[in-house]
């Protein structure tokens, strides 16, 4: 039993592992309406401090007994304190995590895997955000254990600047993504040039 728990705690994928009856979060698990500052975005009228990124991101959720959306929110509320990546791109990482976890998970052994591969347009306020040409390869495991339940998150985000036409990142179509961004304290402000746009402050 201890050996199995060790495997689970490390979120390892073994070929001999059998799928467990874990359950992904229910669609109606503690959802709420998105905060008002997240608005549908149109084409940006200002090109200042704007970057196109080709994103390859994913979040693997490891839990022997299933998990709820509420637990994922609880874990991510401390994201600022435990983030180990490039802090000039923490806002981008939060956006990718929110969008990935608001998608549909794929079962993989004892894990659930959320993936996101898209090209997005990000715009940062003032002089914030990554340097010109700067890229990100971020990988981190975050665990939560209260002796009765264990949940591990393996987060991986690769962001490379590219010139492919992309989508504006903040699309107000999914309240779960907005909930996760609120939990992670994603900092944005309304663009002065385009009132339908939000700028990242981190």
From Swiss-Prot:
Gene3D superfamilies: Rhabdovirus matrix protein M2. InterPro entries: Rhabdo_M, Rhabdovirus_M_sf. GO terms for cellular component: host cell cytoplasm; host cell endomembrane system; membrane; viral envelope; virion membrane. One of its GO terms (molecular function) is structural constituent of virion. One of its GO terms (biological process) is viral budding via host ESCRT complex. It holds the Pfam family Rhabdo_M2. A motif (PPXY motif) lies at residues 35-38. The record marks 95 as: Involved in the inhibition of stress granules formation and contributes therefore to virulence. Residues 115-151 are annotated as: Essential for glycoprotein binding. It is found in: Virion membrane; Host endomembrane system; Host cytoplasm. Homomultimer. Interacts with nucleoprotein and with the cytoplasmic domain of glycoprotein. Interacts with host ATP6V1A; this interaction plays an important role in virion uncoating after viral entry. Belongs to the lyssavirus matrix protein family. Plays a major role in assembly, budding and uncoating of virion after membrane fusion. Completely covers the ribonucleoprotein coil and keep it in condensed bullet-shaped form. Inhibits viral transcription and stimulates replication. Plays a major role in early induction of TRAIL-mediated apoptosis in infected neurons. Inhibits the integrated stress response (ISR) in the infected cell by blocking the formation of stress granules. Most abundant protein in the virion. This is Matrix protein.
């Amino acid at each position: 039993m201890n050996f199995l728990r060790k495997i689970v705690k490390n979120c390892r994928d073994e070929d001999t592992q059998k799928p467990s009856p874990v359950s992904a979060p229910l669609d109606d698990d503690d959802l709420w309406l998105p905060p008002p500052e997240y608005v549908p975005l149109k084409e940006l009228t200002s090109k200042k401090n704007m970057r196109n990124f080709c994103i390859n991101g994913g979040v693997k959720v490891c839990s022997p007994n299933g998990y709820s959306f509420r637990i994922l929110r609880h874990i991510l509320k401390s994201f600022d304190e435990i983030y180990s990546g490039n802090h000039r791109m923490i806002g981008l990482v939060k956006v990718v995590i929110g969008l990935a976890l608001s998608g549909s998970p794929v079962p993989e052994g004892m894990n659930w895997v959320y993936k996101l591969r898209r090209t997005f347009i990000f715009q940062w306020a003032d002089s914030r955000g990554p340097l010109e040409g700067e890229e990100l390869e971020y990988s981190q495991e975050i665990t939560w254990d209260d002796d009765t339940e264990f949940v591990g998150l393996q987060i991986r985000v690769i962001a490379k600047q590219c010139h492919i036409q992309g989508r504006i990142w903040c699309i107000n179509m999914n309240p779960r993504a907005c909930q996760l961004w609120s939990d992670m304290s994603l900092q944005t402000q309304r663009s002065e040039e385009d009132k339908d746009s939000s700028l990242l402050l981190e």
